[in-house]
A protein has these predicted regions:
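Alpha-helical transmembrane bundle of multi-pass membrane proteins
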Residues: 1-216
């Protein structure tokens, strides 16, 4: 529970949602334009792809959707970083590239780590500890959320000082999130179970026999 919630938050989702107006300002959008575009576009894409995930989860399966979405998140974060790193070279195209990359990031998150985090912790625990396990998962989610949001601009500031360049500082922060997404893929291979079409009783029986998550 804590593991999937760690990766759900540490790929930077809430920094993108909370600070999207500031991120768009850094990319060259101005004032109200940045705030409106960020809020509307991010919100609409998030809602639409979260709805889509409801149809995909039982068609594609949890593990496969996790790997598809997290891979997309990783590449999107790399592209967001590149938009900032090469903003001088891209010029006006920076805005288009950044918006496209951010919306891809939101879309991939909304079909994978977003809903899967909550779904998996509701399925994998034995009945006698399900309430406790879900509570720990929820606590971990908000704890990691607070930590990531609190450190976001500190990371940017630290990288700014390291490189002496604001664009590279912002880019490096998103690349850190991309590295965490890569680690999530490795972690997911071993610890994300496939519960599609498996009853809660069979899941509990699997754990009782000492089965591994990836073998479910």
């Amino acid at each position: 529970a804590a593991g999937i919630m760690f990766f759900q938050q540490f790929v930077g989702i809430n920094t993108v949602i909370y600070y999207s107006p500031e991120i768009f300002l850094k990319a060259g959008f101005e004032g109200n334009q940045a705030a409106i575009l960020a809020s509307v576009s991010v919100g609409v894409v998030n809602v639409l792809f979260t709805i889509l995930s409801l149809f995909l989860i039982d068609r594609i399966g949890r593990r496969k959707l996790f790997f598809i979405g997290t891979t997309g998140i990783c590449f999107s974060l790399i592209l967001i970083g590149l938009c900032f790193a090469f903003s001088g070279m891209l010029g006006e195209y920076t805005k288009i590239a950044l918006v496209a990359s951010m919306l891809c990031y939101i879309a991939f998150f909304a079909i994978s780590l977003g809903p899967l985090g909550w779904l998996i912790i509701s399925e994998v625990f034995p009945l006698r500890v399900r309430g406790l396990g879900s509570s720990i998962g929820s606590l971990a989610n908000w704890g990691f959320n607070t930590l990531v949001v609190w450190t976001f601009f500190k990371m940017i500031g630290g990288f700014n000082s390291m490189f002496g360049n604001e664009e590279m500082g912002t880019a490096s922060t998103f690349w850190v999130f991309a590295v965490i997404a890569i680690i999530a893929l490795v972690w997911g291979y071993f610890f994300i179970p496939e519960t599609k079409g498996v009853s809660l009783e069979k899941i509990e029986e699997h754990w009782r026999k000492g089965g591994k998550p990836k073998d479910l």
